[in-house]
Each structure stands twice: as C-alpha cells, then as structure tokens.
Amino acid sequence: MIKCFDKNNEVYNLIKNLTERLNIEILEVNIFRNKNGGKIQIVLYSKDFSLGIDLLTDLHKMILLILEASLEYSFTLELSTPGIDRRIKSDREFQIFEGKKIKLMLDNEFEEGFILESKSKSFIFKTESKELNVSYSDVKKARLV
C-alpha cells in the first residue's frame, strides 16, 4: 500500500492540475495494489465550498477519466472528504485547516481551540482563554471537531 501525501506520487501528479483549477486540495492519496488490480482512495477538501455528493460524483468522473488514460493497471476509485473528526496528519494540513476548530493534545489532555495561523514550523492555537504558538513537533495528536 502506498499511503501518503507525496508530491512525487503518480496519482497526485496526474490530478493536481484539475484540483488546483477547481480550488480543491488533495489531502491524501492511498493506493492499494494486488495482482488483480488495485484501489485508489483520494481525500479532497475545499476551504471555499462544500464538496457535496453531486460535486464528488462529477469529480469522480473527471478524475477517473484522467487516471484511466494514464495508469496501466485496473483499479477502483474512491473519493471522500476529510470528515468532521479527521485526524490532522501533517504540518501541511494545519495550513489547509486554518480557521477551523480542532482538539489538540500537547501534553496528556486535549484542548479545544482554533488554528489562527499556520507558519513553516509552528501555528497559532487560540482557546477561550489563551493564544499559543505551537511547534508542530510538540503536537501529540490533533483532530478536527
């Protein structure tokens, strides 16, 4: 299985022009391969609009055409959105989810707050009572709420 956000990933590179033009972020690409073909799972997100079922259906058709024209193995394609309680998996996702409410674990307990601003090595986390500059390396867990 290839599970990643990797800018060198073949699937990512095949669909990035389409998603960039539509102002949609590729959060994750999971590729499962076996002797009979494979399965490709892609998680998409947009800050500007909701990715509802109708839009995902249209995106599925467009992405499927792009991938079928280029990939030399049979596969099924699954598209999804991050979901309300997505675990934040990378520094890049803190930038993507700027302004969103999260649960953050730094020590051994969760705190709820908002990602105010994402920087190269840290982000500003605002709770009801304080603002913290949090280094990505200090984050034990984080998820959307």
Curated annotation (Swiss-Prot):
Please verify whether the record's keywords include Cell cycle: no
Which InterPro entries does the record associate with it? Ribosome_maturation_RimP (IPR003728), RimP_N (IPR028989), RimP_N_sf (IPR035956)
Among SUPFAM superfamilies, the record links this protein to: YhbC-like, N-terminal domain (SSF75420)
Q: Where in the cell is it found?
A: Cytoplasm
**According to the UniProt record, which cysteines are disulfide-bonded?**
none
- What biological-process terms (Gene Ontology) are attached? ribosomal small subunit assembly; translation
Q: Which UniProt keywords apply?
A: Cytoplasm, Ribosome biogenesis
Any one cellular-component term (Gene Ontology): cytosol
Domain of life where this protein originates = Bacteria
Name the HAMAP family on file: RimP
- UniProt function note: Required for maturation of 30S ribosomal subunits.
Family that this chain belongs to:
Belongs to the RimP family.
Q: What is this protein's record name? A: Ribosome maturation factor RimP
* Organism in which the protein naturally occurs: Borrelia garinii subsp. bavariensis (strain ATCC BAA-2496 / DSM 23469 / PBi)
